[in-house]
Each structure stands twice: as structure tokens, then as C-alpha cells.
Amino acid sequence: MLTIPQEYTTKCESAGTVSTLSYGEKSLLLYSPIEPSDRILYLIHGGSGDQHSFFCPEFLNMVDHMIDNGVLEPLYIVSPCFYDPAEKDKTPSSSGIAVKKFCKELREQIIPSVEGYIGVSFSRKTRAISGFSMGGVTTWYAFLQALDLFYWFLPLSGDCWVCGETGGGKYPEKTATELVSAVSRQGSPDFRIHVITGSKDIAFPNLDAQIKAMEKYPAVFGEKLNYEVLEGGVHDYETIFRYLFNAMPVLFSKPEIQA
């Protein structure tokens, strides 16, 4: 896996802009590239975080340099928060409840607000969702509930909790069958899942067990599922930025995909 060039940590002269968008009682952050784009990534923070967790200089500078150097096609990046504004309990159990219901908010409020603001009607083949840790759990819930909205799924160091907290590790076979059923229930559309974690990540045992169970269903997942493990990779944002540096250029890269 490639490392992020040191110069990508510095401010880029050709930088995109970050806007704050409000909807209801909440707000989110939107990164807009200099040039208009028909591609958009919804990027979800980890447990105890918020919409600012990803949008730090380290990440934004990296994205700016990637686009400026032609490593990454221009894209919009949306950073929402899955917690309610008054939520004080951000334990894993409480966070699990928050992310389970977040997909409804994503569908009914966030996507219409963001894409209405941009003024572009994105299709599922140009719409991706990703997240770190609990954001990864959120990404799996989107797969379970919103295959009509997204084609690209990039869960980072977070397993699927459809069978309960850390269910990917506790109940890998049942989790896999739930994911299979979700594909069928939603009309068996085409999709791509790119899963990344690290060998020393606390999420590795749960996610690894889940992916191995999913690989037993090649007719459903097969080449649509890509799984990477970074040797020595740990559970922090610095490592996740490296995953995104490697994975984002691959998003939206297959011209043969169908809506």
C-alpha cells in the first residue's frame, strides 16, 4: 500500500473550498473541488467524533494535492455527523443505535440538502459512501438499506452490526447471510465493496471474520468485494487517511458500470 507523500501534508495552492450546510437542527461540511464534478463521496466519522473529524488540514491538504496532481479526479466530499445535537452518550452501544437510524436521515435530509445545494443530480454510480470505525458500521447499514442510492461502499475498520454490536465477529455467518438477503431484497443491483483494515487494528478480528464469511457467497459478492489488510495498520485517523489515499482514486473508475 502506498504511503502519502510528505509534500501532501502541506497546503496546496490549488485548494478546494469547505462549506457548512445546515439541515434541521444539524449541520455538515462539504468539500467542493475547484472544478465542478459529477462524483460525490459521503464520508462518515468514527465513534465520539463529528463532522470535523475528517475535515482537518492533514486530510484536506492531501485531497487538494491528489486532485491538483491528477492522482484523483475532482469530487465532492460530504462529512456529516450521525449523533443528534443533544446526544451526550457516545459509547459504542449508543453509537450503534445512532448509526442504525442514520441511513434514514441520509436519504431524507442529507442527500437532498447537499445535492440540491450543489445543483447536480448524482446517480448511484457516481455516489459513494465510506466511513471509519463506527462510520464503517454506518457504511454497512447503507449497504443493507440503500443500494438504490450508492454503488460504491468503502467501509474502513468497521464491521457490520446488523446482528448486534461487533456482530461481524460474533456472528460472521449470520451477518453474511443478512447481507446476501439485503442484496436480493433490494433487487440485486450491481455494486462494489472495498474493505480496508490493519492487522493491528482493534476492528480486525471482527471484520476479518465477517469478510471470510462473505467470501463463501461468490455468486453474490465475488469480484464485487475487495478486501485489503495493511500489515501493522492500527485504529487511528492517520492510518485511515492512508487507506483513503489509496482507495479514493479507484472509486468511480469502472466505465462499464450500470446505474
Which stretches of residues belong to each language-model region?
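Non-catalytic cap/lid and distal C-terminal segments of serine-dependent acyl enzymes
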Residues: 1-259
